[in-house]
Amino acid sequence: MTATAQQLEFLKNSIQSIPDYPKPGILFRDVTSLLEDPKAYALSIELLVERYRHAGITKVVGTEARGFLFGAPVALGLGVGFVPVRKPGKLPRKTFAEDYALEYGTDTLELHCDAIQPGDVVLVVDDLLATGGTIEATVNLIRRAGGSVKDAAFIINLFDLSGEARLKALGVESYSLVSFPGH
């Protein structure tokens, strides 16, 4: 099934916009409202699975935490393994770590060293693309493990925050079900 304009509008309307959260001047796009609607949640997964069904994906990677909510069911739909990328100290085996910049400071993400094998073709799935910092760190981890990133898929793209351009500079195509301006 290819996404129709009506389906995408349904998904977009299922995402609540919360003004002045987490601080004044921000219009927060709340993907949890999509998760609360079983039809919207199922449709978002179905559309992503259909898009990547014949893309040769061997692993799906999701970034903590909401990337797990979308990435794991997409992996099941594709019949491939799901690999979590987590915050430091949450994975029990040996990990690769990647620091990345936040608006104020830095953070770190980790990936099990043996979760991605050389030659794996990886789809990264997350809930939202904004500036692309988290996804860039995730892509770097996958590449360090020997995998290649086929695409990065999102439910929401905040199109004016440069995340798509950042991914393109890394040689990664991005796809989003819906787009909003970022505030």
Swiss-Prot record:
EC code: 2.4.2.7
Spell out the molecular function terms from Gene Ontology: adenine binding; adenine phosphoribosyltransferase activity; AMP binding
Name the catalysed reactions: AMP + diphosphate = 5-phospho-alpha-D-ribose 1-diphosphate + adenine
Location of the protein in the cell: Cytoplasm
Output the GO biological process annotations, alphabetical, semicolon-separated.
adenine salvage; AMP salvage; purine ribonucleoside salvage
Query: CDD domains attached here?
Result: PRTases_typeI
Task: Quote the pathway field.
Answer: Purine metabolism; AMP biosynthesis via salvage pathway; AMP from adenine: step 1/1
Gene Ontology cellular-component terms listed: cytoplasm
- What SUPFAM superfamilies would the database entry show? PRTase-like (SSF53271)
Keywords, alphabetical: Cytoplasm, Glycosyltransferase, Purine salvage, Transferase
Assembly and partners?
Homodimer.
Task: Show the PANTHER family listed in the entry.
Answer: ADENINE PHOSPHORIBOSYLTRANSFERASE (PTHR32315:SF3)
What is the similarity comment for this entry? Belongs to the purine/pyrimidine phosphoribosyltransferase family.
Summarizing the function annotation, the protein's role is: Catalyzes a salvage reaction resulting in the formation of AMP, that is energically less costly than de novo synthesis.
Name the UniProt record assigns to this protein? Adenine phosphoribosyltransferase
What organism does the UniProt record list as the source? Erwinia tasmaniensis (strain DSM 17950 / CFBP 7177 / CIP 109463 / NCPPB 4357 / Et1/99)
